[in-house]
From Swiss-Prot:
UniProt-recorded name of the protein: 8-oxoguanine DNA glycosylase/AP lyase
CDD domains: ENDO3c (cd00056)
Keyword terms: DNA damage, DNA repair, Glycosidase, Hydrolase, Lyase, Multifunctional enzyme
Primary role: Catalyzes the excision of an oxidatively damaged form of guanine (7,8-dihydro-8-oxoguanine = 8-oxoG) from DNA. Also cleaves the DNA backbone at apurinic/apyrimidinic sites (AP sites).
Catalysed reactions listed for this entry: 2'-deoxyribonucleotide-(2'-deoxyribose 5'-phosphate)-2'-deoxyribonucleotide-DNA = a 3'-end 2'-deoxyribonucleotide-(2,3-dehydro-2,3-deoxyribose 5'-phosphate)-DNA + a 5'-end 5'-phospho-2'-deoxyribonucleoside-DNA + H(+)
Cited InterPro entries: DNA_glyclase/AP_lyase_Ogg (IPR012092), DNA_glycosylase (IPR011257), HhH-GPD_domain (IPR003265), HhH_base_excis_C (IPR023170)
Family affiliation: Belongs to the type-2 OGG1 family.
GO process annotations (BP): base-excision repair
EC number of the protein: 3.2.2.-, 4.2.99.18
GO molecular function, a single term: hydrolase activity, hydrolyzing N-glycosyl compounds
Amino acid sequence: MEELLKELERIREEAKPLVEQRFEEFKRLGEEGTEEDLFCELSFCVLTANWSAEGGIRAQKEIGKGFVHLPLEELAEKLREVGHRYPQKRAEFIVENRKLLGKLKNLVKGDPFQSREFLVRNAKGIGWKEASHFLRNTGVEDLAILDKHVLRLMKRHGLIQEIPKGWSKKRYLYVEEILRKVAEAFGESPGKFDLYLWYLVKGKVDK
């Protein structure tokens, strides 16, 4: 852990303004966004699973509110055009998730751990990591996003022995708690800490 904290201290000053700016955007979306805005963000998180944040951002710009109203085949075609690896399946997930429209604002404002579990149980294409990602991107600070970049860092620094092949609730919460302790030692919430980790790995602050 000490070596990771040293690496993070080296980039703290240059990363902090970018992290704070990005988190303000997240909070604004959570506080001022419409149900449709929040649904588009949930769809972004569905798309980034087994793809990339860059691809998800590109799709979000191209499709916009189409996530809310496009017919299934049109949405699948749009995802094909932006190069998604699984356009048909992801389009099916997004269309099925439209049943959650009207519930998202309450989830963002509710208890983050209960909201995350609700999404894991009720949203298609959303697991523990993706639910954490959505809630963090709407201004929730308490959850860790355990993606492959973060897990590789944790393994390299001896925080975990191996990268999990899949997530049960128990396993996710266990690894999240390890990362939470590192975030606390760094003086940041898990949600913001993730952005510092991204900056360390990628040299930029994505969402």
